[in-house]
Amino acid sequence: MRIASSIVLTSLAVSGCSRHAPDKMSFFVTSVATGSGGSLGGLAGADAHCQRLAEAAGSRGRQWRAYLSAAAETGQPAVNARDRIGKGPWLNSRGIQIAANLEELHGANNNIGTMTVLPENGQRAPFPHDILTGSNPDGTLAVGDMTCRNWNSTSGYAMFGHSDRQGGRGNAGSWNSAHQSEGCTTAAFRETGGSGLFYCFAAQ
C-alpha cells in the first residue's frame, strides 16, 4: 500500500510539472509588478522585466517584449503595442495557444480569458485583473495621456485591459483596453483592481 501510494504521488507530481511548458511559452502576464507603479523604466525597462521573469521560469532563446504602447517624443515616433510583439502564434505558459496571429489576437476569436492568461510560472493563483497596456482594442496607442508618461512616471494615467474580460466598468470585456486608471501610482492602480502587471510576448 505504501509503495502504491508513493507511485500515485509521484505520478501526480510529474503530471503537475508537465503542465508548465516554458519551452513552448510565448505569452504570459507578469507574476510580479516592478514595484514602482507606472514608472517601469520606459519600454526598455518593461522589456527587461519580461525577459528576467521568462528566463527565471525556464524560457531560453527568446526575445521578450512588453505589450505596451508609448506616445511620440522628441525625435521618436509613437509606438503601438501590436508592433512590438512579433507575428505569432503565441502560447501561454502551459502550451495553450491564445492567438495565431495579430489579427486573431486583436479580434473576437482570440483565446484570452481567465483560464488562459497565466503568469510565466504557469500557476493559476488569483491576481489583479487590471493589466497595463496604454492601448486601444486594436493594439495601437490609446488617445490621451494613457501611458504614465511613457512608462517613466507615477504621474498621469494608464489604459488597462481586463485579463479575465469581466467587470462593470468601461469596456469591461476587453483584454487590452477596458478603462483608464485613477493615476500611475501603485495605490492608484489598486483602486480599480490593478497592481502594475503587464502582458509579455515573445517577439521571436
Report each predicted region and the residues it spans.
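Secreted/extracellular ectodomain signature
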Residues: 18-204
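C-terminal motif of bacterial Sec signal peptides marking the signal peptidase cleavage site
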Residues: 14-16
